[in-house]
Amino acid sequence: MSKRISLTQFLVEQQRQHGRIPAQLRLLIEVVARACKRIAISVNKGALGEVLGSAGSENVQGEVQKKLDIISNEVLIEANEWGGHLAAMASEEMDSIHVVPNRYPQGEYMLLFDPLDGSSNIDVNVSIGTIFSVLRKVGHQHGVSEEDFLQPGKFQAAAGYCVYGPQTTLVLTVGDGVAVFTLDRETGSFVLTQSNLQIPADTHEFAINASNHRHWAPPMKRYIDECLAGREGPRGKDFNMRWVGSMVADVHRILTRGGIFLYPWDQREPDKPGKLRLMYEANPMAFLVEQAGGAATNGEQRIMDLMPGKLHERVSVMMGSKNEVERVSQYHREHREAAGH
């Protein structure tokens, strides 16, 4: 049997050999992983733990909160606020940032997270997950504000997600490739099961909510119509559609075997650039996808180059296999040029 490498050992070796991970960042990632284990226990208990169903409240996005959304958010805050690695946290479930209380030491990092992505799938037992992103606090001034969080995704120090499915799997990057860890329930440790994950440049799978076809912009309609035309169409090959409705599950499949994930702008809410959150979902997933050799764009710009104007900013998302993402971007460019923009 090959030697099993735990998450802790992997991070320590990265710190020693490559200098990629400062000690504070390593400890922060370990705390996030421990919090994910606690969330996994609550998710796995399901109805037995009386954690399913709606909490009867809405988050800042105007979405009905599930009980597990609130539990997961509290787990992440409680686990991370006292360790001395963080200055503040921001969550999709909270209106404003959570500054580390004065009674605890403050660190140089800021943690952003979607505590339970895909939570609309909780009650039907479909894979859901936690997405997280780590930024460094810029400057040495005392205190931290919302403005400190407004950095392009290219400045992320680390990003990852934990998917709660048939296995509990942690997928992580610190800017040196993508590593996958599987939770060994017997020992309680995350164990390295894949390193240097790579997304194939070409694919025959796409992930999109096709029921919104009539609301899309012309370049998105063109791309999907060509995929659906299959072998007889301009692409000359058949495509499969996969859509779970949980970003973690859909992107995990794409990281594992290729594909393109699409959550575009649509005309039902024309003033909103998209539905997914730039800081909590798009940036960390874009970092992972790019580190795995893929690409991530909003149709006009690389996602990790976007300068956020506010904490809960939304964005169109097209990410995955590089050649397909480039094709979608090309269709958007051609449409803009034809329209004279």
UniProtKB/Swiss-Prot annotation:
CDD domains linked to this entry: FBPase
Pfam family membership, one: FBPase
Domain of life: Bacteria
Cofactor, how bound (note): Binds 2 magnesium ions per subunit.
InterPro entries assigned: FBPase_C_dom, FBPase_class-1, FBPase_N, FBPtase
Pathway where this protein functions: Carbohydrate biosynthesis; gluconeogenesis
Keywords of this entry: Carbohydrate metabolism, Cytoplasm, Hydrolase, Magnesium, Metal-binding
Reactions that this protein is recorded to catalyse: beta-D-fructose 1,6-bisphosphate + H2O = beta-D-fructose 6-phosphate + phosphate
Similarity remark: Belongs to the FBPase class 1 family.
Name of this protein: Fructose-1,6-bisphosphatase class 1 1
Organism per entry: Leptothrix cholodnii (strain ATCC 51168 / LMG 8142 / SP-6) (Leptothrix discophora (strain SP-6))
Gene name per UniProt: fbp1
